[in-house]
Amino acid sequence: MPLWSTPAEPTAKRAAQAHTEVTGSTPTHTASAPATWSLIGEHIDHFGGIVAMCVGKLRAATAVSPRTDGVVAVHFYPAQGEPAHDSISLQALAELATARQPSTDAEGQPVIPPAPEGGLAARVGGIVYTMINRQLLSRETAGADITIASDIPEGAGLGADAAADVAVALALMGADADLDAPLRARVADVCTQAVNTFAARPALRARHSAALRSTGEGVCII
């Protein structure tokens, strides 16, 4: 059974250092979120069923700073492998969001939009776009540099993507203080909505909820 040790250096510190190196700017905010794993119920999460989740000690962290050119630039440093760099404009995100809206054909029959195909920039940029439109970020937001560092191995069932999503949202909000439970529930909903609108890999809502709301003690029932 594979085991992953907790790194000695905080993930948020590594994200901030990488952000400064790659963008030349000091991050305005950093945030992190834990790994998650499903105990039972993940197959009924989509239908609103009860899910039992746990969180781990490994974390993903995000550092952010503003841009003024309407672009979301993403720099991802995974637990294993080479860094990835991608970008997307807020205008392109708006067009992708429009394409995902349901419509009707000439006979009035519903037309189901195609599944999203977005990669790294679309997933992370989609969180920015959705937070703006759900009034969690100012409509004056004109782009962002976003650097993600993760200690959570991909494909291990530990919610590496969900942890990164949550860390991005918290950093964008400048969530230095504790958020109350209703706001945490709203942020989880926004993360899931964004990922399912823009990203090729769909989200498990319960992972976002657990990463935001679990105390880390015992099982989180969602």
Model-inferred region functions:
Residues 1-162, 166, 170-184, 190-199, ...:
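ATP-binding N-lobe of GHMP and related small-molecule kinases
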